[in-house]
């Protein structure tokens, strides 16, 4: 049983809270039984699994107070696992024409800096579309603790890509807070582009899009939506249309 705070695995878990160490080590950490199970179901192999002594879980036992001390959640943590960062499938990004593209389009994010939003959008994509999530400039690390928790395990089955908007399939549609066409403008889009709630999409991304669409909001309510909520609404529209049309993979 691990009883020393100087144990190398505990020190590694602490380091994995920071992006620079996750990238250097090629690892990220999860906490909780649900995320451990999600990783195993997806076929991922943890580097190691640390469990609170007396929890009855499988793994290397750690004195409970020590395990809590390296947790990003605090007390109550029963299991922490370290995993190799999964490789994204870049073959999902290639030119398409007409209806001859992946059944549901990809989501492209630019400047979405909140890891909770990134993780939630990864989960939404896993639920609604077959194409990848593509992270452009200034997006949060999808393997940060908050993003991993928000993805609810989808980070294993649908790890996002990092690429520029120019790599994504055409035609592209931009989701904008104001001044766009109705959501019907999204119909037929191969890539849905979204930006942060406050800043929106930069001009270079808007220019790469064939259309712009705006989600209609009720008068007197908020003037914009959280980007994760907007992504869910728009992705559901596109996926419903694709299922009705019976699109198939290229």
Predicted feature locations:
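Structured adenosyl-cofactor binding patch, chiefly the S-adenosyl-L-methionine
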Residues: 81, 124-128, 139-156, 203, ...
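RNA substrate-binding interface of SAM-dependent RNA methyltransferases
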Residues: 86-180
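Short, acidic/turn-prone active-site loops that include or flank metal/cofactor-
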Residues: 54, 64-67, 138-140, 197-199, ...
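Short, hydrophobic beta-strand segments that form beta-sheet elements in well-ordered domains
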Residues: 28-30, 45-53, 160-162, 171-177, ...
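Glycine- and other small-residue-rich loops at beta-strand/loop junctions that grip anionic moieties
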Residues: 2, 28, 110-111, 136-137, ...
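N-terminal positively charged helical leader segments and presequences
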Residues: 1-79, 96-97, 250
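Active-site/ligand-binding-proximal alpha/beta "capping" segment
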Residues: 174-221
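Glycine/charged-rich beta-loop-alpha catalytic/anionic-binding loops adjacent to active sites
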Residues: 59-62, 102-107, 208-219
């Amino acid at each position: 049983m691990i009883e020393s705070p100087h144990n190398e695995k505990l020190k590694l878990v602490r380091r994995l809270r920071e992006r620079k160490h996750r990238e250097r080590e090629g690892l990220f950490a999860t906490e909780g039984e649900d995320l451990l199970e999600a990783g195993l179901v997806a076929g991922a192999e943890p580097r190691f699994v640390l469990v609170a002594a007396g929890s009855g879980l499988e793994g290397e036992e750690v004195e409970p107070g020590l395990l809590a001390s390296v947790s990003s959640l605090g007390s109550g943590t029963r299991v922490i696992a370290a995993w190799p960062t999964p490789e994204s499938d870049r073959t999902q990004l290639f030119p398409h024409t007409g209806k001859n593209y992946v059944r549901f389009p990809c989501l492209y994010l630019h400047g979405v800096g909140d890891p909770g939003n990134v993780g939630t959008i990864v989960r939404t994509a896993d639920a609604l579309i077959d194409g990848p999530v593509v992270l452009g400039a200034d997006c949060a690390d999808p393997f940060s603790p908050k993003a991993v928790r928000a993805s609810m395990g989808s980070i294993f089955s649908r790890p996002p890509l990092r690429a520029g908007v120019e790599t994504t399939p055409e035609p592209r549609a931009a989701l904008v807070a104001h001044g766009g066409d109705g959501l019907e403008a999204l119909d037929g889009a191969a890539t849905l582009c979204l930006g942060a709630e406050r800043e929106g999409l930069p001009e270079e991304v808007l220019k790469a899009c064939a259309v712009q669409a705006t989600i209609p909001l009720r008068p007197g309510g908020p003037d914009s939506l959280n980007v994760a909520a907007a992504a869910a609404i728009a992705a559901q529209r596109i996926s419903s249309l694709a299922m009705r049309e019976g699109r198939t993979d290229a």
